[in-house]
């Protein structure tokens, strides 16, 4: 099976990061050659850029600067980690990708979805995800989850007002409308177990479609159904 690029998207507090970790372990247990990574970050240079973007002291960061920093982190991450993994036939699970930039900077920051996509088109060299899962949660509930999680370190985006987070959600809806075949929606307000099951079922179905011959079916339950 050729390498496959699967991305996970959602607003703050959607719970996708936790789900990715669990899905990653399940795929490993089923013998899938898979890696887990994130944006911005995943490698040394991009993690340093992440710390600059997320630093709560950098409230003066201008919108275009923010968009370009994300794009720079994305490029280095692709070159060092994602491209090599895909070339080796691995499944890549990535926490956020270009859709985040379109929703956050393109729509919520008001830079324009098309304009931000143009920046990223130069960066990604047509490397769009094969499958994207959007974790759907109302912005208010997502922020309530963050507030209740005492172990989560607050970043600069967490400090934005509710209007911004609602705009991010609206931005995602516009991105989903542009890429309806690629982006699948997960109801993230369910219990974690239900969210994981829905996520794994979509990924399993997708991987089975791509698996040549179809002799080694992947399923959430570990049985033959």
Curated annotation (Swiss-Prot):
Q: Which residues bind ATP?
A: 10-17
For this UniProt record, the keywords arranged alphabetically read as follows: ATP-binding, Kinase, Nucleotide biosynthesis, Nucleotide-binding, Transferase
Q: Name one Pfam family in it.
A: Thymidylate_kin
Catalytic activity annotated for this protein?
dTMP + ATP = dTDP + ADP
GO molecular-function annotation terms?
ATP binding; dTMP kinase activity
Q: Share an example GO biological-process annotation for this protein.
A: dTDP biosynthetic process
The answer to keyword Phosphoprotein applying to this record is: no
Has UniProt tagged this entry with the keyword Kinase? yes
> Which Gene3D superfamilies would you find in this protein's record?
P-loop containing nucleotide triphosphate hydrolases
> EC?
2.7.4.9
Question: What is one cellular component GO term in this UniProt entry?
Answer: cytosol
InterPro entries annotated for this entry?
P-loop_NTPase, Thymidylate_kin-like_dom, Thymidylate_kin_CS, Thymidylate_kinase
Task: Quote the function comment for this protein.
Answer: Phosphorylation of dTMP to form dTDP in both de novo and salvage pathways of dTTP synthesis.
Q: Which family does it belong to?
A: Belongs to the thymidylate kinase family.
Query: Record's NCBIfam families?
Result: DTMP_kinase
UniProt protein name: Thymidylate kinase
**From what organism does this protein derive?**
Oceanobacillus iheyensis (strain DSM 14371 / CIP 107618 / JCM 11309 / KCTC 3954 / HTE831)
From the broadest rank down, the organism's phylogenetic lineage runs: Bacteria, Bacillati, Bacillota, Bacilli, Bacillales
| Name of the coding gene | tmk
């Amino acid at each position: 099976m050729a390498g496959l690029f699967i991305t996970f998207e959602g607003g703050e507090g959607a719970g996708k990061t936790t789900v990715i970790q669990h899905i990653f372990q399940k795929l490993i247990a089923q013998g899938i050659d898979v890696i887990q990574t994130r944006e911005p970050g995943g490698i040394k240079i991009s993690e340093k850029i992440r710390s600059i973007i997320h630093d709560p002291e950098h409230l003066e960061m201008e919108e275009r600067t923010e968009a370009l920093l994300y794009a720079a982190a994305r490029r280095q991450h692709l070159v060092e980690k994602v491209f090599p993994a895909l070339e080796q036939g691995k499944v890549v699970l990535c926490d956020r990708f270009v859709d985040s930039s379109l929703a956050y900077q393109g729509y919520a920051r008001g830079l324009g979805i098309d304009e931000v996509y143009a920046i990223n088109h130069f960066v990604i060299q047509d490397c769009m995800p094969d499958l994207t899962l959007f974790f759907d949660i109302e912005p208010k509930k997502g922020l309530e989850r963050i507030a209740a999680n005492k172990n989560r370190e607050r970043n600069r985006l967490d400090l934005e007002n509710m209007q911004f987070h609602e705009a991010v959600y609206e931005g995602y809806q516009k991105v989903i409308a542009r890429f309806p075949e690629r982006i699948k929606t997960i109801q993230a307000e369910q219990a974690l177990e239900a969210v994981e099951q829905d996520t794994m079922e979509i990924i399993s179905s997708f991987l089975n479609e791509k698996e040549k011959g179809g002799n080694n079916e992947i399923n959430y339950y570990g049985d033959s159904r």
